[in-house]
Amino acid sequence: LGKSFSGVKIRILTFRHPLEEFDNSLAVDVTGKGINSIGEISVSGPVVYTRLIAGDEKAFGGSLTWARDTNDRTTWHRTGDLGYIDVENRIWLVGRKKHRVELSNGVTLYPKQIEPILDSMFDIRTALVNGPNNSQAFIIVENNNQNWKILEDKLKHSIPTLCKLLKNNIDFSFVPFSQSFPVDSGHQAKIRREELSIWLCNK
């Protein structure tokens, strides 16, 4: 995403506790910088809105999207996006908080760390989703004109590259989807991952 600009402050806040004992209303910074310090991208400043209009405030999280710093009493908007700040103070996006996938072995994966790489390498559209018991990292591949067997072989050969980038040995499983991905009615671009997850678990 780049660096923050004048008038807008950005912090990477903690967004959950391993035991789920977590107060979302408190602004607590993630310690450290870099890929191992992923948290919720949060913003504060005069141009940051204080609430959404009418029913949208409740529909999109309401008070859960706000955190308060008890030291300086500033208010921070939790964007719902996860990311980190590197040593050069650049902000990196890894995906939406609700789209992260927590595998049964304790490893957490984020869409933006995987999908853009596969999409650009093979000219396809992919979606990381929650699968049965999350025993594997399930990647759904949207319908395209490529031969699936050939494409699947290429995807499997890319696993070592992905594992190296993620610095983890991940058991990936690639699943073909015979149609176009379901998308939101507004932007016609945001993948409805929950539907893909249900489809996968019912296969």
Regions from the PLM with identified roles:
Residues R11, P18-L19, R90-W92, V107, ...:
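Residue-level signal for well-ordered, solvent-exposed loop/turn and beta-edge residues enriched
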Residues T14-R16, I85-D86, S185-G186:
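Short, acidic, Ser/Thr-enriched surface-loop or helix-capping motifs
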Residues D29-L103:
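Conserved ATP-binding/catalytic segment of the ANL
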Residues L1-S37, Q146-K149, K154:
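Conserved adenylate-forming
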Residues G45, T50-R51, G80-K167:
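AMP-binding/adenylate-forming catalytic core of the ANL superfamily
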Residues V101, L128, P160-K203:
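Conserved C-terminal "lid"/linker of ANL adenylate-forming enzymes
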Residues R16-P18, S135, N144, F177-V183:
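Short, internal active-site loops enriched in acidic
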